[in-house]
Swiss-Prot record:
Keywords: Ribonucleoprotein, Ribosomal protein, RNA-binding, rRNA-binding. GO terms for biological process: translation. It comes from Synechococcus sp. (strain CC9311). Pfam families: Ribosomal_L18p. CDD domains: Ribosomal_L18_L5e. HAMAP family: Ribosomal_uL18_B. This is Large ribosomal subunit protein uL18. Coiled coil: none annotated. The gene is rplR.
Length: 122
């Protein structure tokens, strides 16, 4: 019996989740990718295979305001707030949340809560 690394476990969970999650133009998928040093969020229309809007800790809008580490929960809150504002500006209110195989805890949860508080429904 072989054991899977953490990355392989995350990829396995993500494949399992993606069988049931799909985004449309009216209700796109809010996909979250978490690396060791940054966090990324995209709104994806799976039918058209296009990204409607995105935000990350690498955005110029956030880099100037983030004085601390970009891998913190505070940075995730800022990304969640920014992606929600960009979605609402495009007229998107409802999304399907895709945690990307990560556990719903810590930075992923902080991003989701901030997006909800900014007006996205999921």
């Amino acid at each position: 019996m072989s054991t899977l690394s953490r990355k392989q476990q995350t990829q396995k969970r993500h494949r399992r989740l993606r069988r049931h999650l799909s985004g449309t133009a009216n209700r796109p998928r809010l996909a979250v990718f978490r690396s060791n040093s940054h966090i990324y969020a995209q709104l994806i229309d799976d039918e058209a295979q296009s990204t409607l809007c995105s935000a990350s800790t690498l955005d110029k809008d956030l880099r100037s305001s983030l004085k601390t580490n970009c891998s913190s929960c505070d940075a995730s809150v800022a990304v969640g707030d920014l992606v929600a504002k960009r979605a609402i500006a495009k007229g998107i209110q409802q999304v399907v949340f895709d945690r990307g195989g990560n556990l719903y805890h810590g930075r992923v949860k902080a991003l989701a809560d901030a997006a909800r508080e900014a007006g996205l429904q999921f």
